[in-house]
């Protein structure tokens, strides 16, 4: 049902947006309900917000221009790794795609998904956790030698880089690996700027951890893998090696040191033979699908959901999906000049007062946004009065 809806929108929008069909992106997110009873699509499942409420799961495909292509709505307790292939099959069938590269994050890169997209003319690009690689591959990734720059055969030792001159450069290394019967192209990048960013983020988390130790030690028992509390440990032994009368909290220096060794490194796996830098660039565009979810949740108020029936829940997300397509179209027509918030606010402010027998009087102030909008779509509604005939023509224009 969801994929068919996407297909119809795709056909109607073909003349409006040139869909990039070679590379598509897939991701999942959850939407919570202000209800406590789980039934139908509403089920208790893993939630990033950690709210004790039922959720539904949405899977979304997007093209390389950030335009959504298809979505599915699944029960909140569904394993998200199983949701991609069924929707992808429907997408390929509806859009008659003959060649496809699917880009995902590590959480959706199950071996079965990688193998599926290694058949025929399909391909995959997925982020790869260096920490989860086999020991010898992990050592190879972190080895300071045999790195190179884009379009260069010169070898570099990243332990000898100039902090200032090389701060904006991205270094690469690559090799083919065979994991569980699947040949994959492992690509690793290293950047001083990315290293410094990770250190900055961790520094803030360490400060929060130290503050927790000092001011709120009772909160230590509630932590997650990416929580700053992972840097805190309980200790029952004094620095002198004696058993303490009472356990105490301190920073876990071992965890901090282990994480530091990965600073600046980023890895992807793919079955493509393309240039490493090109593949990394494709993977970087995943931020657009994360932005799609953020826009739906914040600007389109897709959550919390207050609906009970499954058919109405699906209808709710169809409306959000259609709104997202229209927003992407408007954004591209305006040259991505305005944030989503400003664009929506500008549209909401464009109101008219109907004057019987004469037409419509604009009640909004003429701004740079309204000028850009009128120029992009070849309309003019900021005149003193828009006649009834003129408004009919404008409305007809939007349906062509």
Predicted features, each with a name:
Residues 1-400:
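Anion-binding and metal-coordination hotspots
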